[in-house]
Amino acid sequence: MNARENAIVQKYALSFVEKVSDHADIWDMYDQISDLISIIHDSKLNRILLSATVSREEKADFVRTVRQSSFWQINDLIEDVIRDGHADLLLETLERVQLQISKFKNEFEARVVSVYPLTEAQKERLRHLVEQRFSLRVRNITEELDQSLLGGFIVTVNHKVIDASVRTQLKDIRKKL
């Protein structure tokens, strides 16, 4: 994405968050935006939106079929993106809206990669650690399993990382030797 497109995406996202920042339903909107992002990824809709061979009208029709949000603000955002001819930036816009809501509320999703699933007690300890270390609130913890870590975990929150994996520790030891 070039600087011009980045500015367009940022404009849409900031405008949307300014409109909805006082709503009590902001996290419900966040969840519906997450659902839309999942639909776009699962259906490979972004390939169509980025394609130069698909007409602007066809792109608009495809997007309108998935734009069934119960919040008029989300539907208006999507309609604005389509109307302005930026359907190819829809996915990036929705992702940026999520990021801006999280920044506004200082509440973020945490992604944890570990060898084994975490217990609820471990998740709570991890939530507390992340909230203290990064001075933010953790809204949700998403787990991913990866056997190549050998042990430990990697936590990613708002582009910040805590890497306590055995694999990384072994690499550090190897560098020192």
Swiss-Prot record:
Keyword Chloroplast attributed: no
Places the protein is found: Cell membrane
Principal location listed in the UniProt entry: membrane
GO MF annotations, alphabetized: proton-transporting ATP synthase activity, rotational mechanism
Mode of membrane association: Peripheral membrane protein
Keywords: ATP synthesis, Cell membrane, CF(1), Hydrogen ion transport, Ion transport, Membrane, Transport
Cellular component, GO, one term: plasma membrane
Function of the protein: F(1)F(0) ATP synthase produces ATP from ADP in the presence of a proton or sodium gradient. F-type ATPases consist of two structural domains, F(1) containing the extramembraneous catalytic core and F(0) containing the membrane proton channel, linked together by a central stalk and a peripheral stalk. During catalysis, ATP synthesis in the catalytic domain of F(1) is coupled via a rotary mechanism of the central stalk subunits to proton translocation.
Assembly information from the UniProt record: F-type ATPases have 2 components, F(1) - the catalytic core - and F(0) - the membrane proton channel. F(1) has five subunits: alpha(3), beta(3), gamma(1), delta(1), epsilon(1). F(0) has three main subunits: a(1), b(2) and c(10-14). The alpha and beta chains form an alternating ring which encloses part of the gamma chain. F(1) is attached to F(0) by a central stalk formed by the gamma and epsilon chains, while a peripheral stalk is formed by the delta and b chains.
HAMAP family in UniProt: ATP_synth_delta_bact
NCBIfam families: ATP_synt_delta (TIGR01145), PRK05758.2-1 (NF004401)
Annotated protein name in UniProt: ATP synthase subunit delta
UniProt organism field: Streptococcus suis (strain 05ZYH33)
